UniProtKB/Swiss-Prot annotation:
Subcellular location: Plastid, Chloroplast
Subunit comment: Part of the 30S ribosomal subunit.
Gene Ontology molecular function: any one: structural constituent of ribosome
Any single GO BP term: translation
NCBIfam families: rpsG_bact
Keyword rRNA-binding among UniProt keywords: yes
Organism: Gracilaria tenuistipitata var. liui (Red alga)
Protein name: Small ribosomal subunit protein uS7c
A Pfam family of this chain: Ribosomal_S7
CDD domains recorded: uS7_Chloroplast (cd14871)
Protein family per UniProt: Belongs to the universal ribosomal protein uS7 family.
Domain of life from the UniProt record: Eukaryota
């Protein structure tokens, strides 16, 4: 184990337009090759598309989508006595939010559609309506944890 001091958690800066930490976290997930301006443009465009399609506040839809996509439990590999067990663990709030954002962006990339903003908007709308690949991934994670509930006493 490292003897150095633990690294400090970086504070997340709010985004310039919506003053939201979630939007800046989503932008960080969209970001490629340091092109933050382009990432912000994609996210803001996606939020505008959500606003037009649903006629609700896009930030509320984003928050609802992340809440729906956040897993409660996940499995982690733990090696005990020569065999590896998938041990179900509770997911902390920050990690859950990050997993939800990661899944939303990953499935937005794999979607077919015109632009990344359009695909991202559709994925967020689907997640807020509890449908789509992101929700399927969360359910799959929960099923894995449920199937390996017998190994829960190996928690660390």
């Amino acid at each position: 184990m490292s003897r150095r001091n633990k690294s400090k958690k970086r504070l997340i800066q709010k985004d310039p337009v919506h003053e939201s930490k979630l939007v800046s976290m989503l932008t960080a997930r969209i970001l490629k090759s340091g092109k933050k301006g382009l990432a912000y443009k994609i996210v803001y465009e996606a939020l505008d598309i959500i606003n037009k399609k649903t006629s609700h506040d896009s930030l509320e839809i984003l928050e609802k989508a992340i809440r729906n996509a956040t897993p409660l439990v996940e499995v982690k590999s733990r090696r005990i006595g020569g065999s590896t067990y998938q041990v179900p663990m509770e997911v902390r709030a920050y990690r859950g939010t990050n997993l939800a954002l990661r899944w939303i962006t990953m499935f937005a990339h794999t979607r077919s559609g015109r632009s990344m903003a359009f695909r991202l908007a559709n994925e967020i709308i689907d997640a807020s309506n509890e449908s789509g690949n992101t929700i399927r991934k969360r359910e799959e994670t929960h099923r894995m944890a449920e199937a390996n509930k017998a190994f829960a006493h190996y928690r660390y």
